A protein has these predicted regions:
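Surface-exposed extracellular loop regions of Gram-negative outer-membrane beta-barrel proteins
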Residues: 9, 13-58, 72, 79-121, ...
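Hydrophobic transmembrane alpha-helices and their helix-loop junctions in integral membrane proteins
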Residues: 61-64
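Gram-negative outer-membrane beta-barrel transporters
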Residues: 70, 79-83, 100-222, 268
Length: 304
């Protein structure tokens, strides 16, 4: 059985306090357990030993409405805690062709017998139970809208903090971290923030949004260091050559800005100009995946 409950309390006008608790249980999918495939240049291996994950999550928060002259909106603040047991996570590394574990010595023997080219067949991701995990955090947001003469202002801002860590991790699991000293779960950003601001004047609207994502403290170590025991022509082999240097140059995180301008031509049509990644920031949300450069879009919308 899975148990969940929640409630909301309204102690005064425009004030809402909420709390909730819920249990969760997830079986591994058929693909995670039995299917071997190749997606987007990456081998996906099955794991017949994988076990279901389960856990619970709790949240408490408050939402407060406000009005200051012609400006009104609400502020929302909440804290949360999630606990996982036998948490499932895709782990990148070398696996045997059937998805079972393969030692460095066995892998080196395969390369010696068949050449370096065969190594790609053993490299990929596999869903794996990573023991237990603890994810506390909090988030805050503000939404508001108001008028100043003929101008209409709207703002949306939010911030999220999480600190996901394993519970009593063993040394074998930590050895797969690019920075085991931090013990933060892989592929997570501790800080995320966003603000969106727009001004409307009659038929014209201009707006901007700014997003900040903190440095991803941990990824699979296989992406940042040479492959153990694999040497070609006297040089160590890397999966993503230079990625470790790329990460070290971006330890302050990424700030990405977008801008937009639109004109109401008639009551049923609108012309918009959008610029995504205004300052052409080069950034990545995971190893080997560089996100979009500056993009300019012209859009015409017509309502029938």
């Amino acid at each position: 059985p899975v148990f969940r409950f929640g409630g909301t309390y309204n102690p005064m006008e425009y004030t809402f306090i909420r709390a909730s608790y819920g249990q969760g249980y997830r079986f591994p999918s058929i693909a995670e357990k039995y299917i071997s495939t190749f997606v987007g240049g990456l081998n996906i291996f099955p794991n017949i030993q994988i076990q279901p994950e389960y856990g619970w999550s709790a949240e408490i928060g408050i939402k407060q409405g406000f009005k200051i002259k012609n400006f009104q909106g609400y502020v929302d603040v909440s804290g949360f805690l999630t606990r996982y047991a036998d948490m499932m996570e895709f782990m990148f590394g070398f696996y045997d062709l059937d998805g079972s574990d393969i030692s460095d010595a066995e892998l080196a023997a395969v390369v010696q017998a068949n050449g370096f080219g065969v190594l790609a067949n053993y490299l990929g991701a596999r869903s794996t139970n990573i023991q237990n995990a603890n994810i506390p955090g909090f988030e805050a947001s503000i939404v508001g809208q108001g008028d100043i003469g003929d101008f209409s202002l709207s703002v949306l801002a939010g911030y999220t903090f999480i600190n996901p860590t394993p519970i009593n991790p063993d040394s074998a699991y930590l050895s797969t971290f690019s920075d085991p000293d931090s013990q933060m779960l892989k592929y997570r950003n501790k800080h995320m923030a966003k603000i969106d601001f727009q001004v409307d004047y009659k038929k014209v609207a201009i707006g901007t949004s700014v997003r900040y994502t903190s440095f991803m403290e941990n990824v699979d170590k296989a992406f940042t260091e040479p492959l153990p025991g694999v040497v070609i022509n006297g040089a160590p082999v890397e999966i993503l050559p230079g990625y470790g240097t790329y990460r070290n140059a971006r330890r302050t995180g990424d700030i990405v800005c977008d801008a937009r301008l639109s004109f109401g031509i008639t009551k049923t049509s609108r012309l918009s100009f959008l610029i995504n990644n205004v300052f052409n920031r080069e950034y990545s949300n995971r190893p080997g995946n560089v996100l979009h450069p500056r993009t300019v879009i012209c859009q015409y919308a017509l309502k029938f």
